Amino acid sequence: EFREDEQITFDGKKNEIINGYPDWVYEEEFGFNKGFYWSPKGDRIAYYKFDESKVKEFQMAMYGGLYPDQNTFKYPKAGEANSVTSVYVYDLNAMTSKRVDAGKKKDQYIPRIKWTKNNDKLCIMRMNRQQNQLDFLVTDLSTSQPFELKADVFFTEKSDTYLEVGDDLTFLADGSSFIVLSQRDGF
C-alpha cells in the first residue's frame, strides 16, 4: 500500500531541534547518518529528537569560492552541554507520536535504537557521558500508555575504562534472546 508523503514532526528548527537526523556528536562519534528506523511490519517509525538549543555555536570559514563563507553550527566541546536526546515512535495508523522514557538524566547518550523481531518492542541503548556503562532497554508498544512509553533495562555492559558502541546487536526469532558482542574479559 502506498500513501502520500506525510510530515510527522512539526517542531524542527535550525540549530535548535533536529528530528530523524543525527546531530554532530552522534554523526561523528557514534558513526551514523540516519536517525529513524521502520518497525518490522512497517507501521511505525522510531526516530531521534535532538534538542541542541543549549549547545554553543561554532563558526567555520568555508573556502572554495572567491570569498570564504561562514558556516555556523552547533558544536559541543569537551565538558560543554551536549544535545538532549530523546526517542519517539510514530504510529502510521494512529498518526501520533509517543516519547520513549529512556531515563531522567539529560546528560546521557542514546547511541543506538533497534527494533526487535517483535513489531511491538523497540530496543534503546543508553550510555552515560563517561561512556563506561551501556544499558540496553526495551519498550513495549502494545501497552496503552497515552503519551509516553516506559522502557526497562534488560542488560548492562560496564567497563572501568571505556565501551565501544557497535551495530552487532542481533535479536533472535524466539523473541526473548539476543546476541551482542561483549567487551568483557576474564572468560
Positions of PLM-derived features:
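Hydrophobic beta-strand positions in blades of beta-propellers and related beta-sheet-rich domains
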Residues: 1, 5, 45, 87-89, ...
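Beta-strand C-termini and the immediately following turn/loop, strongest in propeller blades
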Residues: 1, 34-37, 46-52, 77-81, ...
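A conserved hydrophobic secondary-structure block that centers on an alpha-helix together
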Residues: 1-15, 105-112
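Predominantly five- to eight-bladed beta-propeller fold
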Residues: 5-36, 44-99, 145
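Short loop/turn motifs that cap or connect beta-strands within the blades
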Residues: 9-12, 100-104, 155-159
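Short glycine-/Asp-/Thr-/Trp-enriched loop segments that recur within the blades
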Residues: 15-32, 104-110, 159-166
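Beta-rich catalytic cores
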Residues: 32-34, 83, 109-111, 132, ...
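Long hydrophobic segments that form regular secondary structure
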Residues: 91-128, 142
